[in-house]
Curated annotation (Swiss-Prot):
Belongs to the universal ribosomal protein uL13 family. GO terms for biological process: negative regulation of translation; translation. Part of the 50S ribosomal subunit. InterPro entries: Ribosomal_uL13, Ribosomal_uL13_bac-type, Ribosomal_uL13_sf. PANTHER family: LARGE RIBOSOMAL SUBUNIT PROTEIN UL13M (PTHR11545:SF2), RIBOSOMAL PROTEIN L13 (PTHR11545). This is Large ribosomal subunit protein uL13.
Length: 153
């Protein structure tokens, strides 16, 4: 039997919506990263973007386990000498763009390769329940029902 290798024209991309309310960030990010790459499909091809389009809503309501909400640090650099800055997860989630926590978690679980930017472009994260992708008729994926540890108590 021959190994199937998909061509870009043969890829069937679906739209998936995930409600992140009460979900653990790392567990959510690993499931989203797998869906974005297409590794859940039998016809996965490493050199072709065969993953689905994923919409994550309620990103400001994600949970951290342990003390990570107060202690986890995110670093960035301003570009100037000595310009390293640090923000906690609490500061980001209570700020203007809480969806960055989910975006960074997923981004750091994807491999840095030729398809990285293209795959990351298939991720849409929104802080509220509203999203502008109703025309694509996304299917809901209940991540909390996949494993009881995905939901924080």
């Amino acid at each position: 039997m021959k190994t199937t290798s998909l061509k870009p024209a043969e890829v069937d991309k679906k739209w998936i919506v995930i409600d992140a309310e009460g979900l653990v960030v790392g567990r959510l990010a690993s499931i989203v990263a797998m869906r974005l790459r297409g590794k859940h499909k039998a016809a996965y091809t490493p050199h072709v973007d065969c993953g689905d389009n994923v919409i994550v809503i309620n990103a400001e309501k994600v949970k951290f386990t342990g003390r990570k909400y107060n202690q986890k640090s995110y670093f960035y650099h301003t570009g100037y000498p000595g310009g390293i800055k640090e923000r906690t997860a609490k500061f980001i989630l209570e700020g203007r763009f809480p969806e960055r926590v989910v975006e960074k978690a997923v981004e750091r679980m994807l491999p840095r390769g030729p398809l990285f930017r293209q795959i990351l472009g298939n991720l849409r994260v929104y802080k509220g329940t509203e999203h502008p992708h109703e025309a694509q008729q996304p299917q809901a994926l209940d991540v909390g029902a996949l494993n009881r540890k995905n939901v924080s108590a």
